[in-house]
Amino acid sequence: MFDWNEFKILAEKLKDEKDEASQRTSISRLYYAVYWKARLILEREDPNLRVPEYNAHKFVWDKFSGKNKTRNAISRKGRDLRRNRNDADYEADIRKPKELVNDSFQIAEHILFYLNQIQPK
């Protein structure tokens, strides 16, 4: 099975590059590393969980909502990181790509911290 954390490692390598393509790719790979960690936790918690193909990302982040403060934070910040990833992947003009990279890494670190708190041992 693929180790999704390898995307985070790649994102960290790309984040300090000067070209916008590397910065955008960094955000995208970071997002997928965090998304898959979150999704796999949900799937471990509930082996019968079926993530739909359509709107899978919304489903995953929404699934954390409403349970407790930690899970609500994961849900909220997951949606924030997804918004940044969508901007990086789909917007032709990003005014300050380096700020978007920094913001994305800050959000991701919060999510990963919270995910580590709830991750089944």
Segments (PLM) and residue ranges:
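Terminal alpha-helical segments
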Residues: 1-121
